[in-house]
Amino acid sequence: MVSSFTSAPRSGFYYFAQGWKLVSQPGIRRFVILPLLVNILLMGGAFWWLFTQLDVWIPTFMSYVPDWLQWLSYLLWPLAVISVLLVFGYFFSTIANWIAAPFNGLLAEQLEARLTGATPPDTGIFGIMKDVPRIMKREWQKFVWYLPRAIVLLILYFIPGIGQTVAPVLWFLFSAWMLAIQYCDYPFDNHKVPFKEMRTALRTRKITNMQFGALTSLFTMIPLLNLFIMPVAVCGATAMWVDCYRDKHAMWR
């Protein structure tokens, strides 16, 4: 099926909503199963464990609040919960994406072919196995780019006052941008677009990508919904690629 998508770019909210629609398209659902299973097993188990630990972690986190901010404790407590969910959710979604990266790339490729009518390269299990080293190298590039920035932000959490007020906001913005990079990279990588060039392309539509990443980050924190977010985000990011980036960067048409 050739896509009814237009070349006019939409908001990141639109593409996130499209992800929920596209994930259930006939012919696409079978490529959703493996990423979905990885996400359900890892995120489901991780968040179950997290919720058993919150009553220990949150008081520890709040102990860093200085005396002069104690009067704001009733506001800072929910902010602390959100902070833990943000950091924890992003960490485990990163692990899930590492494990499911070859299948996410295949999902993006098949959806792009369906949306555009283009013919992708040979796929299948042997095609996936052949591409695994390249895909893992790409995931490593993302991790190396992300890690030092994440460490700086995590250090901010241990600064009294800043860690309970400014750091959660900065982490949310950072995770929104990183999740946009994570999911938009699958269609870019399918066309062998270098990692640096991909980031430059995303910056040309930074607001759209931040909107998409912010919604993905929020849904990653919500129990049950976060079990389905990986294939949904891959589909939404692929729709964005088709509308906004494919004409300039596509390797196969």
Swiss-Prot record:
Gene Ontology CC: plasma membrane
Residue stretches spanning the membrane: 31-51, 75-95, 151-171, 222-242
Keywords recorded for this protein, A-Z: Amino-acid biosynthesis, Cell inner membrane, Cell membrane, Cysteine biosynthesis, Membrane, Sulfate transport, Transmembrane, Transmembrane helix, Transport
Main location: membrane
Membrane topology: Multi-pass membrane protein
Signal peptide start and end residues: none
GO molecular function per UniProt: high-affinity sulfate:proton symporter activity
Single Gene Ontology BP annotation: cysteine biosynthetic process
Localization terms from the record: Cell inner membrane
Entry coiled-coil feature ranges: none
Keyword Transmembrane helix (UniProt): yes
Job description of the protein: High affinity, high specificity proton-dependent sulfate transporter, which mediates sulfate uptake. Provides the sulfur source for the cysteine synthesis pathway.
Family label: Belongs to the CysZ family.
Name of the protein in its database record: Sulfate transporter CysZ
Species of provenance: Shigella flexneri serotype 5b (strain 8401)
